[in-house]
A protein has these predicted regions:
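An N-terminal assembly and electron-transfer interface module characteristic of large anaerobic redox
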Residues: 1-59, 75-77, 82, 87, ...
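Conserved phosphate-binding/catalytic loops in two-lobed NTP-binding clefts
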Residues: 13-27, 131-137, 289-308
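Conserved phosphate-binding catalytic cores of ATP/NTP-utilizing and phosphoryl-transfer enzymes
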Residues: 52, 121-158, 166-173, 259, ...
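Gly/Thr-rich phosphate-binding beta-strand-loop-beta motif of the actin/hexokinase/Hsp70
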Residues: 52-77, 154-171, 215-219
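Short glycine-rich, Thr/Ser-proximal phosphate-binding strand/loop in the N-terminal lobe
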Residues: 60-95, 99, 176-183
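Glycine-rich phosphate-binding loop plus the immediately following alpha-helix
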Residues: 86-90, 172-212, 230, 303
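Glycine-rich phosphate-binding loops at beta-strand->alpha-helix junctions
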Residues: 118-120, 253, 266-291, 301-306
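Adenine-nucleotide phosphate-binding core of ATP-dependent small-molecule kinases
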Residues: 229-260, 303
Length: 311
């Protein structure tokens, strides 16, 4: 409580953003760079981040660890989207751009400005001669509150990604405190991908399967380490638990880890907005809502959140 109050006091009275680390987190050089970039962005680009309306024709490309996304916006409306698994960074980007252009009916020459974000932002930014190359913490928070119609006041953004997770406390569209990372891939969307493969369903079907269960809290599940988590999956199925209960238990385990490791590090305010591809897994959203005792908001186009923020 004291830590949260001190953090809130610093943010509200000094306008200095606060980045948090959980005590058990193993921070990599890439996540440290992202954090430092975010602090710099918040300090230097507050006016840009405070914009509430998109104008003209712009494109955002989000090169994530698992998927690459593209969004084209025209006068505050999404007119084109593209999505595909990340393989070769530049080829994946070119493919999703082609998809978005085809859907929008526009040509590359029609695009007035380009923004890139995600792990491949620098490479793609150079490839496209982008006008904005920005880390995903500030970009995702902006995209989240924009799509959730929560640009005024407080909000909490949760993004459970393929390699790391982000929890961001936002006020008037600008992050105040945030944390990023996790101990192991067992606490990320990667574990849910592994769960779906073990259950013989596509990751896009895992959410519907998990919702057939009451919650799966009674299924022993340890995803603190992805190796032990895999063993838990095998043991649960061998013990006769139904696939839907195992799916729900995996969602509950990931939500619990994010809550224990990261959501203690930010000041949680409603609305709580879940974004990213994992937000389409209904069982995970349900588990997070139960963990926080609130109704979690999943906006339309939530899987394109980084691309929307970049655009």
């Amino acid at each position: 409580i004291v830590r949260n109050e001190l953090r809130r006091y610093i943010v509200e009275n000094s306008k200095i953003p606060v980045v948090s680390y959980s005590f058990n987190e193993r921070t990599s050089s890439s996540t440290l760079l992202t954090r430092l970039e975010a602090l710099s962005t918040i300090a230097k680009r507050r006016e840009l981040m405070a914009r509430e309306v998109q104008v003209g024709i712009t494109m955002g490309v989000d090169s994530g660890s698992s998927t690459t996304k593209c969004v084209i916006m025209k006068d505050n409306e999404i007119v084109g989207t593209g999505w595909k698994p990340t393989t070769e960074v530049l080829k994946s980007a070119d493919d999703v751009i082609a998809e978005a252009l085809a859907e929008s009916g526009l040509k590359m020459s029609d695009i007035e400005a380009i923004g890139t974000t995600g792990y491949g932002r620098f490479l793609i930014g150079k490839h496209l001669n982008a006008d904005l190359v920005q880390e995903e913490l500030t970009v995702n928070s902006k995209g989240a509150v924009y799509l959730a119609n929560a640009q005024k006041g407080f909000a909490t953004v949760i993004d459970i990604g393929g390699m790391d997770n982000k929890a961001i406390s936002v006020n008037d569209g600008i992050p105040g405190s945030f944390t990023m990372g996790g101990i192991c891939a067992g606490a990320s969307g990667r574990f849910l991908e592994m769960t779906s493969k073990r259950l013989g369903v596509d990751i896009t079907e895992l959410g519907a399967l998990s919702m057939k269960s009451a919650g799966g809290e009674d299924v022993p599940m340890n995803s603190y380490c992805i190796v032990f988590g895999t063993q838990s999956l095998v043991n649960a199925l061998a013990a006769g638990y139904k696939p839907e209960d195992v799916a729900a238990a995996s969602c509950h385990s990931v939500a619990q880890q994010v809550y224990e490791q990261q959501l203690q590090e930010v000041d949680i305010k409603e609305p709580v907005i879940m974004v990213g591809g994992s937000s389409l897994i209904q069982g995970l959203v349900r588990a997070m809502g139960r963990m926080l005792n609130t109704e979690v908001v999943v906006p339309h186009h939530s899987q394109y959140i980084g691309a929307v923020g970049a655009a």
